[in-house]
Curated annotation (Swiss-Prot):
One of its GO terms (cellular component) is cytoplasm. Catalyzes the reversible phosphorylation of UMP to UDP. It comes from Dehalococcoides mccartyi (strain ATCC BAA-2266 / KCTC 15142 / 195). Belongs to the UMP kinase family. The gene is pyrH. UMP binds at G54, D74, T135, G136, N137, P138, Y139, M140, T141, T142. InterPro entries: AceGlu_kinase-like_sf, Asp/Glu/Uridylate_kinase, Uridylate_kinase, Uridylate_kinase_bac. Pathway: Pyrimidine metabolism; CTP biosynthesis via de novo pathway; UDP from UMP (UMPK route): step 1/1. It comes from the Bacteria. Its EC number is 2.7.4.22. This is Uridylate kinase. ATP binds at K12, L13, S14, G15, G55, R59, N163, Y169, D172.
Length: 241
C-alpha cells in the first residue's frame, strides 16, 4: 500500500466532474466512479473533505451576463452545488462510506449547517464531509470556498481535480498544442502568470496560509492515490520554489 503524505485533504470537484460525457446535468455512473476512487483513499486512512461546484447545472456568472441579477444568479448556483453534494453523498454511502453534507446555505432538511468544529470532528471519526453552498456569499466562486474550507479545517493539501486536464500549462493545451506542463509553481508565480488555476482570491488565500495545491486529472487511473501519496502527478503549487 502506498505511503500517505497528506493525512487530511480537501478535494475540489468541479460541476463538470459530475456530468461525464452527457454534457449537462449529472451522469450517475460517473459520480459512482468518483465515489469509488474516494473510497479507496478513505480506506487508506486519509481524512477527506470535499467542495463541489455546480457548473454542470448552473453558472451564476454566465446567467448574470444574460441579464439575471448577479446575486440571484449566484444563489441559484449555490443551490446547484447542493444537488451535486447530495448525489455524491448517496454514491459514497452506497460504497459503505459514512458521509455528512454541510451547507453554507440553510437547508436543514437535507444538510447540516456549516460548522467548522463539527466538520473537523466528523473527519476525525473517519467520515467524509461534503461542503455545499459555496461560501454562502454571492460573487464568491467555489474555488474560493475550497481554499477557505481547506484552511479552516487545517487540511494538508488542496486537491484541484480537473476533467481531462492533467495539470497547469503555459497556455490552454486544447487551443495551443505546443503548450507545456508545469510540474511545479509557487503561488506567486501562478498569480503573476495569470494561469487561471483558480481565481485570484482563492490563490491569495492559499498563498497567505502556505496551503499547497495539486492540480491533476481526476480521470487518470488511481490519480487520487498518487496525489495523497506525494507521487509526481499534475502540477504542484506551493510556497516553496
Amino acid at each position: 500500500m502506498a505511503e500517505i503524505k497528506y493525512k487530511r485533504i480537501l478535494l475540489k470537484l468541479s460541476g463538470e466532474a459530475f456530468k461525464g460525457a452527457t454534457g449537462y446535468g449529472i451522469d450517475i455512473p460517473t459520480v459512482r466512479s468518483i465515489a469509488h476512487e474516494i473510497k479507496h483513499i478513505c480506506l487508506m486512512g486519509v481524512e477527506v473533505a470535499i467542495v463541489v461546484g455546480g457548473g454542470n447545472i448552473w453558472r451564476g456568472a454566465t446567467a448574470a451576463k444574460e441579464g439575471i441579477d448577479r446575486v440571484s444568479a449566484d444563489y441559484a448556483g449555490m443551490l446547484a452545488t447542493i444537488i451535486n453534494a447530495l448525489t455524491l453523498q448517496d454514491a459514497l454511502e452506497r460504497e459503505g462510506i459514512v458521509t455528512r453534507t454541510q451547507s453554507a446555505l440553510a437547508v436543514q432538511q437535507v444538510a447540516e449547517p456549516y460548522i467548522c468544529r463539527r466538520a473537523i470532528r466528523h473527519l476525525e471519526k473517519g467520515r467524509v464531509v461534503i461542503f455545499a453552498g459555496g461560501t454562502g456569499n454571492p460573487y464568491m466562486t467555489t474555488d474560493t470556498a475550497a481554499a477557505l474550507r481547506a484552511i479552516e479545517i487545517e487540511a494538508d493539501v488542496l486537491l484541484m481535480a480537473k476533467n481531462k486536464v492533467d495539470g497547469v500549462y503555459t497556455a490552454d493545451p486544447k487551443k495551443h498544442p505546443e503548450a507545456t506542463l508545469f510540474q511545479h509553481l509557487t503561488h506567486m508565480e501562478a498569480i503573476n502568470k495569470r494561469l487561471q488555476v483558480m481565481d485570484a482570491t482563492a490563490l491569495s488565500l492559499c498563498l497567505d496560509n502556505k496551503l499547497p495545491i495539486i492540480v491533476f486529472d481526476l480521470q487518470s487511473s488511481e490519480s487520487l492515490v498518487s496525489a495523497i501519496s506525494g507521487q509526481p502527478i499534475g502540477t504542484l503549487i506551493s510556497s516553496e520554489s
